[in-house]
Amino acid sequence: MSAADLDYFSEDEQREIEAELDTGFKDIEEKYAVTAQKGFETMLVVDNIPIVDGSKKQRLLERLRQTFAKVGAPIEEESIDMPWNAAAGTNKGFVFLTYPDVKEAENAVHTLDGVSFGKNVLHVNRFGDIQRFASMPVGEGDLPSGWKEKEYIEKDYLRNWLGDIAGRDQYVTFWETEVTVWWNGRNGTAEALKGPDGKPVKNSKWGELYLQWSTMGTYLASLHRVGVALWSGPKLDGPIGVNVLRFTHPNVRLIQFSPCENYLVTWSEDPLPNYENHPNAALRDTFGPEDEGNQYVIWDIKTTRVLRTFPGDKSAIGVDDTQSRMSWPTFKWSADDSYIAKCNVGAGISVYELPTMGLLDRKSIKIEGVQDFEWCPMSQKDLIARQEGKGKECVLAFWTPEAQNQPARVNIMAVPSRTILRSKNLFNVSECKFYWQSQGDFLCVKVDRHARKAKSKKATSCNLEIFRMREKDYPVEVLEFKDYVPQFAWEPSGTRFAIVLQAETNLPSVSGASTKYSIDFYQLDSKKGDFIAIKHLDSKMANTLVWSPKGRHIALATIGSSSKYDIEFWDLDFTIDERREAAELGANVTMLGTGEHYGITEIAWDPSGRYIATSASTWRQSPEPGFSIWDFKGQQLLHESRDRFKQFLWRPRPPTLLSKDQIKKVRKELREYSRQFDEEDAAEENRGSAEKLAQRRREIGEWNAWRTRNNDRLAFERENRGKSKAKIDVKGQEARVEEWVEELIDETEELSM
């Protein structure tokens, strides 16, 4: 309506007409609007149904009905409508469900969503929601109101440090509040990690609490009072949400990465409050009312999303002695990140599927009296097979103590089928500990045993129950020891292990006295098929065993003593004969060197197995905080003593991408590669020597130039003042100094009678 048309109306009528025009048809639209949910409140859409042909349609419907009834959302077959693709002769991958009333439909939405159906995971939506989203008034290329489009930022290559030309490893040092990332060079030379500007990479935010690398070295985790930050990329920094990931969990104290770096567990001793009305938006968006009172948070790393939260175990964690009674890690990952499990001591094991975090088969595995469990690791071949859907089931081992007339028992179970693969009865058991070989080939159960009729159940002897996981029926070999075994360690990817033996465990502690141990090395005899002792070391002070990641070399360290800080470096295959296989087992076990690190609290090999680091942390009350780097032969390459030194951490490496054939080829041509590396090392050494010589010559030249300038200036000033250079007579000041040296050649003593 034009302004000319309004001239025929009065001013009041014109105002009413303008108001109606401004309002438009809003009141009419609201009056006659059709709600998308109206009439469809009881109808649901279930997506991700397997695609089948006509011959399997009825069977699929029956299985769907059984699954729905099993999880608590039963429905009649007449109420299931399966759309059909007539051209392809198959279903379309979704079904419509119509329940009798709204209450049952709402129950089905919450019950069925995320349910596993074979290899598929069902997704449930209300039919009205789908209608509403489909009819949203959004133009082409537009976004709904309230949505913000984020600019795409390309992520840096997260494993760029592996491309170092010299093949160097990295490590982190944490001193006071200063954190530095270093390259570990040849002969202990350290070079700080530098950014594109050539300056060392440093971040003041790293040193608030403590640091931890992820399992494959992709992320550096720093703990803060408000949560956890993961840093990645060439500079371990960058845009938030891309190279820097934040996980909000106030007062977090402990974290744990999954083996494949997909998930993260965080724990705080303070239960989560209700953040529904909290002023901090990050806390409101992260946690809901259902998370109140929980202490554990399971995260998806890539999306920084909370998968699930759990309360603390009140039975395992006391109010006054949290640190002494808490067992960490509480949650344990399967090797392929498929499952995460928690031991409910005395009741059972709760296994959760990832990423849905739903209980496996919607119920825990009930195991009366269960005390502990461990997942079986996998070789790279097994992991690839699992990813392709061809691998075997995951495996875990657990143990139950003696109860009434029942013996203690170790069980090996397959997951998800819950099939018991092997059981072994045990007697007079104080405690069991599981030690898996890194490839999952062997499982050693260290059984601490007490005397049969002893009143105290303190362990005085030990059995090693070794299960062979690659053989039929999982045979068990038993090694018995009259002494207590405080330490056990498998050789990575090998068939050898080392143990520490302690003769008497009940001796009173004497001030200044040190406990002596013996150390045994065992190896699988390929001819006899048994594990046999290949070397015995007696009267040793070492109580810690640390194998090289590549096997063969092992370090024996004395940690926790107030008077001894010895380190021994051993080679189990040392020989000058290339045909090592001809030698007897144990004949080549040789000590390469010894060392000492005063106040040592930790020891760790680098991923290459060429270097080993010992550190003394001020957190553990070490008298001389600092760190040292040694080569595998025991030669100390670097030592740094610093007050308030806290952490030394090697950066882990992911598994090699080389196949077995490629590795064999490299080993076959190792001499050629060694010659090339020796030439590069010599060139580097010469370059370093030439640089030092040039620097010294430059410094001497600068000194001589400075001295000449000052002499010329002094002579010029003396001449201007009319003074001549003083002549000093040094002849009169000369003194002759003589030194008499008496040498006793023989001494005779005569006695007069």
Curated annotation (Swiss-Prot):
GO terms for biological process: formation of cytoplasmic translation initiation complex; translational initiation. Belongs to the eIF-3 subunit B family. Keywords: Coiled coil, Cytoplasm, Initiation factor, Protein biosynthesis, Repeat, RNA-binding, WD repeat. Component of the eukaryotic translation initiation factor 3 (eIF-3) complex. Residues 42-129 form the RRM domain. GO terms for molecular function: RNA binding; translation initiation factor activity; translation initiation factor binding. It comes from the Eukaryota. WD repeats lie at residues 142-185, 203-241, 321-362, 537-580, 595-640. Disulfide bonds: none annotated. RNA-binding component of the eukaryotic translation initiation factor 3 (eIF-3) complex, which is involved in protein synthesis of a specialized repertoire of mRNAs and, together with other initiation factors, stimulates binding of mRNA and methionyl-tRNAi to the 40S ribosome. The eIF-3 complex specifically targets and initiates translation of a subset of mRNAs involved in cell proliferation. Residues 723-753 form a coiled coil. This is Eukaryotic translation initiation factor 3 subunit B. The keyword Secreted does not apply. SUPFAM superfamilies: DPP6 N-terminal domain-like, RNA-binding domain, RBD.
